[in-house]
Amino acid sequence: MKYLIQKKKQLRNFQKNNIVKTNKLKVKSKTENLSVIRDFVSSYAAEARIEQNIIENIILAVDEACTNIIKHAYHSVPDGEIIIKLKLSGKKFIVTITDYGNSFSPEKIPEPDLQKYYRQKKVGGLGMYLMKTLMDDVEYHSVPGKYNEVLLSKNIKVDKSNVRH
């Protein structure tokens, strides 16, 4: 399992009493790296003392985005690169996911009919819907032939039971 982790590369900027802290992870576009990505997001969010249910939502949204990148942007070719940047700025948790695979048009993806989806026992196809449901903001930027970027942000609450006094 070959992947590069640049986990301890942190930038600290002080802006009006808010610490902005960024972490970065680079992995190859292999499904076995999804667990590495989940652990990376989980440990960063837990260190920031974000409530557990919010952490779980963020992890699921990131997992969906990265799965879509592996399957659709890279067509399951394992040597593509995925870069995940995590940033905590004030009361906002921001995830930026960059890839260099094929781009797509998210506006062409229709809202799913969940009842029909369930009746037809479909598998897959709910990634964008889940990301939009779990996160407060989902953006997609693409420079075709160069890179694609998914920006996920979540307004957060700190779990006060975990705050050290």
List the predicted regions and their residue ranges.
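Conserved beta-strand-loop-beta-strand hairpin that lines the nucleotide-binding pocket
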Residues: 2-24, 70-165
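Short, structured helix-loop boundary elements
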Residues: 31-34, 55, 59, 79, ...
